[in-house]
Structure formats: C-alpha cells, structure tokens
Amino acid sequence: MASVDPSRSFVRDVKRVIIKVGTAVVSRQDGRLALGRVGALCEQVKELNSLGYEVILVTSGAVGVGRQRLRYRKLVNSSFADLQKPQMELDGKACAAVGQSGLMALYDMLFNQLDVSSSQLLVTDSDFENPKFREQLTETVESLLDLKVIPIFNENDAISTRKAPYEDSSGIFWDNDSLAGLLALELKADLLILLSDVDGLYSGPPSEPSSKIIHTYIKEKHQQEITFGDKSRVGRGGMTAKVKAAVLASNSGTPVVITSGFENRSILKVLHGEKIGTLFHKNANLWESSKDVSTREMAVAARDCSRHLQNLSSEERKKILLDVADALEANEDLIRSENEADVAAAQVAGYEKPLVARLTIKPGKIASLAKSIRTLANMEDPINQILKKTEVADDLVLEKTSCPLGVLLIVFESRPDALVQIASLAIRSGNGLLLKGGKEAIRSNTILHKVITDAIPRNVGEKLIGLVTTRDEIADLLKLDDVIDLVIPRGSNKLVSQIKASTKIPVLGHADGICHVYIDKSADMDMAKHIVMDAKIDYPAACNAMETLLVHKDLMKSPGLDDILVALKTEGVNIYGGPIAHKALGFPKAVSFHHEYSSMACTVEFVDDVQSAIDHIHRYGSAHTDCIVTTDDKVAETFLRRVDSAAVFHNASTRFSDGARFGLGAEVGISTGRIHARGPVGVEGLLTTRWILRGRGQVVNGDKDVVYTHKSLPLQ
C-alpha cells in the first residue's frame, strides 16, 4: 500500500463515508449501464464494508438509463413514417421512473453476488423541509448501517417539482452532488467522495495541455484561476456542481475528494491516503503554501535554462562540467556526511539490504563520479554535430544535425549517484532536467543537487536542474507530456513497469536485469570461475549482476563446476536450482527463472547445448546483458549473433555492461527497448535530430523549376 500523504492523514480516522457516483461513471457513451465500472464500484464497497467502514451510496444515472430504454421502446413501436417526423424530447420524469428500477436492479444483483445487502432511498428536496423527515431519515440509515446494509440514495426525479436550472430558492439541494453534500452533513459522514469521469479538479478544461490537476483546493488560491469547461455529457452540472457541493460540505466540516470513477480502485486509494483527485478541506489553507513552485513551472524553467545552455560555446559547456567535477570533490566530506545520515535512517526503518547498498555512497565513489564527468567533458561536443549533408538541388543544401531532446525527467530510487550521472549528461547534451528521488535519499539528493547547481553559471541559471521535493506524486509528473520530453526511471521492476504503463511521455529504461552467464562444455573453467565470481559478487545489487548461471549438461559432475559452486557458497551466495539442478545437485528449488535477486543469490540450471541456453535466455531473460564462456569460437559466434539482448559478451563479465566502462562517460541508464537507444546509454541517448535547409530563394511551385540531385556531400 502506498504511504499516506500528509495532507490526507485524516483518512485514518474515517469510519463513515458517502460515495456519490455520477451519471458519466454509471453509464456508457451510448447510455447503457457501464457494467464493468459499476461492478468494480460494488467490489470496492464490499471491501470497505468488510473492513468495518460504514458506506452510503448516492447514485445518479436513472434518467440516462431510462431515456435509453424509452428511446429503444419508441423506436421498435414506431412506423417508418413516424420516424421521419420531428422527434420530441422524452419526458425526463418518465425517464427517471423507468430507469430507477433498472438501476437499482443492477445494484441489487451485483451486491447479492458479493453477499452484501443494499437498500433504496428516494428523496426530493422538499422532503428535507420537514424536520421530522430528517430525524426519521437519520434513524433509518443508522439502522441499515448497523445491519451492514448499503443505503443507496437517489433524488426522486420522477416526482420532483423543481425546474431547470435546478437550483431552488430554498437552497436545500439541486442535484445529486449537492444531495450528497447535504447527506454528509445530516448523517455526520467523515468523508465524501464524488466520483467523476475526470481525475479531479483541473485549473482549466482537462483536455487542454496547459491545465494541471489541483490536489488540494484552496479558495483564496484557486477560485479565480480555475476555468471550467463543458458540463457533464449526461449529468446536470458537471465539475461546477461538484465544486460547489464540495465547498459547502467541506466548510461544514466534512472533507471531500473529487476523483475519477474510471480509475482502478480509486475509492480504496482515497481511503489509503494516496494523493489522488482533489481534496476539499476546511483547513486546507493551513497546509499548502501559495508560494510553492509547481512541477510544471519547474519544467518550463528548465527548458528556458537549457536554451541558454545551448547558446554557449562548446568550451563554455565543457567548463561547467569541469567545475561540477571539482565541486563534487571539494564537498565530498559534506556529501558523505549527508549520505551516512540517509543510510542510518534507512537501516533504522528496516529497508532491505539491496536498497541500502544502492543508497550508500562508498569511499572512492565521489572521485569515480568526478573522473567520469571529466571524461564526459573532454569528449567531442555532441550538440549541433552534422550527421548527414545532402545537396537536394543546386544551391539547396540539407543538413541533419544533432540537438537536445528538451526536458528530461528522471525518477529514481535510492541511487544518489544516478543524480550525478544524469545531471552531468543533461549538461553535456544541453537538456533541462527534473529529478524525482526517493524519500530514503532525500538528504543525499538535496546536497548533491545544491553542489551541482551552485556550479552552473548565472547566464544559464540554476533552474536548469530541478529537484522535485514537493508532495507531488510520480503520477502527476507523468501527466506533463507537453513540457517533459523523456522519462528515465532508475529503480525497481515495479517502479519502471508502473511508469511505462502510466504516461504518454517516451520512457527509456529497463524493468528487469536478469543477466545470464552460460558456461559451455569447452569453457576454460578457471576463466569461467573468475567471470562468474565477478558477475555475481562484485556488486550483487547492480542491474548487470549475474542472476542465472546456465551450465552445459556435460559439466554437471565436473570438478571445475564444483569449484565454482563451492566458491560462490564460500562467499555467501545462496544458490537455487532449476528443475534439473534441483534434482541433480539438491539445491533449493528456484521460485522462478524470471527473478532478479539483486542480492547474494543466484539460480543455477543445466542446458543441453548453446541453442538450449539461447532459448532459455529468450524465454526467461530481460534482454539486458548475457554472456557465454567458451573456447570454441564457432559456438561463441552463434551465441553472440542469436541472443537478442541489449549487450552480449564472450568471455567477459556482465559487469562490463556500463556506460563508463564502455567509454560513454557517465551513464543515463541501460535500455532494453528497441527504439531510440539500447544497452548502456550515454550522452547520445539524450539527443535527437533536426533538419536544416539552406537555400537561395527556391520554391517548390509544383516542382516545375527544381532539378533534384540528392547528392551526398562531405560533412565538413
């Protein structure tokens, strides 16, 4: 479960929750009931009911469902001539009367399947004018909740006397949003959740790229800046009505969250304290600072600064990197001190050893990082390089040149050294950068960010590299596809997979590092031992560490293999066996071949030959880095040609799969994708291309006056 956001900590005390379901959530585009969404809603209510929450539903949708049904009945009962006549709009009250029974029948059926009882309560605004009605309503609901029955409210539109625009002079309620707010007050709810067809309240129409979600509504800050779009496609008031109801309810003491009824398990996420949707709370103005800089503003500022950086000469950009390297070494003691505080806190918090290992800045690491930055600085300037030059026609020359991508977002867990690597690569490639690190490395990241940005000259601006330390969730950053050009996740399989599934922004990275070493029957076993020990023990938490050792079946009982296995055990490596190795050597059975240990553990299995090894790698590997140890060059070439991984080695440790070791300078990460960049990615992975055409007034004019030559020209 995600950690509770500080602004949502009140959910720990929530017992009674009212959930209002909008028509757009209950129904599909064609007006029919959205069975999947309603079913998912009922499953969440069931789970809450089982956990001891008191859940009250307020549902819309009767009018829409009834209208669809009556239109169908009218269609099947009409002649062709009738259908040619102007069609009168169906009476909304009749639609409500027909739709309500169908809507409740669905709820009743779904809840029965979940072994939950539900009840229907239809009300009108005039009912609430009677104090005795209110008293009886409360008693009835209390009785239902005591019996763990789900009360389902809806306005009785079939007999309501209110006319458009649906706001009565009494101001009791005017739609189901305001009904939900009224019930929250009457029934003393601890929380009101308004489910919509959008993620929450935006600063403008959600379809506009410039609109940003508002996670905590503050009247003084947001009332004037919000621009509402169209109202709901099927309901009465859309977001305007929800905000009005939310403000009234929250001012009366009931917190309100507006969130999407389309998102998976959104209700449970709200009650787990996740920062989704928009929160309305009477104390919100005490939490949020109006001076907070949004991540969107940080991204825009980073792009502006990157353009200043690109305007510098190659030597000026080189000097910035050299200054950064010097600054890191000059501040090593301070950096190590802050990192040690992070490591100590992680150990006290009980973090797993692999994460603590990745978090730790070991002695010599700062010097190593500074060296890689200087190597990067002394490499050929990657920006504005002419990659191709073509004479399109006489005096019409086309150049394909390298240029920065724009603004990068790196989301990383624990690894503070990743911040340094990415920052230096961003500077060298002329890109702006946003950094979102894990809370476990907050002190390390903060000091590293300060040291680096202090070395950036004023004519570029320290906002070139932004460190996101606000409570913004990763999900919010991933929605900034109009201002962020590439996401680079550095962390767990779960983190990378979630990011790839949650954004329109291109993602560069790998979800798994399941690297193999295959020992062929002709291998030099002393060499194999040397390679295997390095691949597993040198840095077990690294993504290029060996996770599976494949061995030719002829070596099963060989002294050389015994020597390797004993050496691994002596170093403290836990060995697990595949089906064959488990049976033959008695190792504990591996849970799965597709498993990244990231620790002192590995899987061993036997294969028939090199092709079997290749098939195993393709089936269970992650296309990261795989190695063969053999003295048979023909077998080696077969392995090198056929293994479809980002990096494939012969007689060399998988630990060589690294940008610095490849001579790329610092490393942005390792990509197992096939588009844009693959394998260890250096500065070239942060570049794109553009076309520059130089002419002398030529025009196309239907190609009448152009003689195309398309002749390749020297680059210089």
Curated annotation (Swiss-Prot):
GO terms for biological process: L-proline biosynthetic process; proline biosynthetic process. Feedback regulated by proline. It catalyses: L-glutamate + ATP = L-glutamyl 5-phosphate + ADP; L-glutamate 5-semialdehyde + phosphate + NADP(+) = L-glutamyl 5-phosphate + NADPH + H(+). Substrate binds at S60, D157, N176. Induction: Induced by salt, drought and cold stresses, and abscisic acid (ABA). Residues 1-296 are annotated as: Glutamate 5-kinase. GO terms for molecular function: ATP binding; glutamate 5-kinase activity; glutamate-5-semialdehyde dehydrogenase activity. CDD domains: AAK_P5CS_ProBA (cd04256), ALDH_F18-19_ProA-GPR (cd07079). Gene3D superfamilies: Acetylglutamate kinase-like (3.40.1160.10), Aldehyde Dehydrogenase, Chain A, domain 1 (3.40.605.10), Aldehyde Dehydrogenase, Chain A, domain 2 (3.40.309.10). Residues 297-716 are annotated as: Gamma-glutamyl phosphate reductase. Pfam families: AA_kinase, Aldedh. ATP binds at residues 196-197, 202-207, 236-242. Its EC number is 2.7.2.11, 1.2.1.41. Keywords: Amino-acid biosynthesis, ATP-binding, Kinase, Multifunctional enzyme, NADP, Nucleotide-binding, Oxidoreductase, Proline biosynthesis, Stress response, Transferase. Pathway: Amino-acid biosynthesis; L-proline biosynthesis; L-glutamate 5-semialdehyde from L-glutamate: step 1/2; Amino-acid biosynthesis; L-proline biosynthesis; L-glutamate 5-semialdehyde from L-glutamate: step 2/2. Expressed at high levels in leaves. GO terms for cellular component: cytoplasm. P5CS plays a key role in proline biosynthesis, leading to osmoregulation in plants. Involved in abiotic stress tolerance. HAMAP family: ProA (MF_00412), ProB (MF_00456). Tobacco plants over-expressing P5CS1 and P5CS2 have elevated proline levels and display enhanced abiotic stress tolerance. In the N-terminal section; belongs to the glutamate 5-kinase family. In the C-terminal section; belongs to the gamma-glutamyl phosphate reductase family. This is Delta-1-pyrroline-5-carboxylate synthase 1. The gene is P5CS1.
